[in-house]
Amino acid sequence: SSAASDVYKRQVVSYVSTENARENLTHDATTWDFDAVRRAAQDEWNEWLGRIEVKGGTQQQRTKFYTDLWHVLLGRHKIDDVNGEYPDLTDGQRAGSFTRDIRVKTRTLPRDAAGRVVHHMYNSDAFWLTQWNLNVLWGLGWPEMPDEMSASLIRYADNGGLIPRGPCAGGYTYIMSGCPATPLIVSAYNKGLMRKCDPMHACLLYT
């Protein structure tokens, strides 16, 4: 191509298989229209960030505020595919901060009456000290997130017997100490936001 040519690439990811990646591509990357994709991304972010409106302050302060909100919503990534499959890497031997001899499994999320997965599975950094900030802010602006994340964490525990501290690609990382995910799950329940998993089942996982 010439130096003035534009090069376009569509890219998707699957944690399960190349076949699933191709299916994700067909579902999620349906156009070569770059401007249309950009507008859709802007509309999506405006919808999420626009749930909290601020007035006053300088343009620089407002920019910083919404940049911080963007970070609040970043860092947790779906690992399930369009067909509902996701990797389970919880079955192995713990060795310090790692899991050895992992037996990789592919699991499939259940679907509701409308054919949608009941919740998504997520990667996430640890929830260390988020009871002071993230848990509260999510509950105010994005109440579906504590519900989604709690359901994901509970399913990790169903698969591997532990509620993850920082779930990664369907497995455990053993980062931090204690169980920083617990305040998030309890917060979702106390606020009446836990709808995608059974609270009693979640409680029994701690016994």
Walk through the language-model features, giving the residues of each.
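Short, small-residue-biased leader/transition segments that mark boundaries at the very start
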Residues: S1-Y8
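Active-site cavity-forming subdomains of large catalytic enzyme subunits
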Residues: S5, M145, A151-S152, Y156-L205
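Function-dense linear segments that define catalytic or interfacial modules
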Residues: R10-Y122, W142
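Extracytoplasmic/secreted proteins, especially bacterial periplasmic and envelope-associated proteins
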Residues: A40, E44, Q60-T67, W132, ...
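Secondary-structure capping and boundary motifs in well-ordered enzyme cores
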Residues: Q60-Q61, H120-L129, T173-A181
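Alpha-helical support elements that line or immediately flank enzyme active sites
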Residues: L69-V82, Y122-P146, V186-L193
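Flexible glycine/proline-enriched surface loops and loop-helix/loop-strand junctions
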Residues: A114-H119, L129-T130, L134, A169, ...
